[in-house]
């Protein structure tokens, strides 16, 4: 068995102020403005590695025996309190695993694919960068790092890092339709993972030695950027590199706002934290509405509400957190009107409940058309309902 060390984990050349990351360097307290700026940039560059590792610990409980196994696998849609990942999807079934390839390959299988609903394998490296998105997976995929194994089941997929995440999504058209849920669960049940048992958990500690002021400034910049830049521009997709194709700050801000975000070609996410006037969305201010035409997508679309303070789903009595293209009630002209308020009442159509404090609305577009990918089509921001 290979030793799980930082040297094994970080073979990729990642330039930092401390040089190539093969071990956790210990930054000294900044002594000048230039030193401070360099350390903030260093922190920002390392954040996605550490955040990915923290999710690996969260999903496995720090138990290496849970690597190469599903750490999240619910046959029902996630509810408030079950959403481990910040801004988790509530429009698909999830299966998530963290894999370690130091002891050999891992095989993914999709034994019961469906042509009638969207499903995918989203593969991410140790940096929260997408290295492969498999749409409508069918059959087997052998994931390996380094030398290609002599025996490959199905398609061989080279993984750029020893530690990697596998996120699967299966579309649910209507959670209240028993037949539809059964169809989604059939695809879910057919998705398997097989790999060696790991006996030692990797240890990644890249941020703990930074000065508190450095960390605070880095997070301030990430939060500030996340509020003004479209989420899709903060995602590193297949064939892209952080720092080259996506600025480090964008990559880290996107990781913090929603770790596990897929590449735009898979699904584009549009997060709205403000109303049409630029003011922060707050449930205590009253009701908001969005009137929109159907987004141009090949698969499906949805809108979901989150508590901006926690980044999690907001609890409600009906466990209703999203509306999608199947469940949305349309206006006569084909558009849809969505309402966001503290308490949805009988007779309210396309209504989602929000917290009294800040909230955000995330629109997800699965297999988006070019107009979404190039920014020519965007969903309108919520408008505050004026009281008579």
Task: Outline where the language-model segments fall.
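Bacterial N-terminal signal peptides that target proteins for export
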Residues: 2-14
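Short linear sequence elements within intrinsically disordered, low-complexity coil regions
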Residues: 14-15, 326
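C-terminal motif of bacterial Sec signal peptides marking the signal peptidase cleavage site
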Residues: 21-24
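A compositional/structural signature for long, glycine/proline-rich flexible linkers
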Residues: 27-388
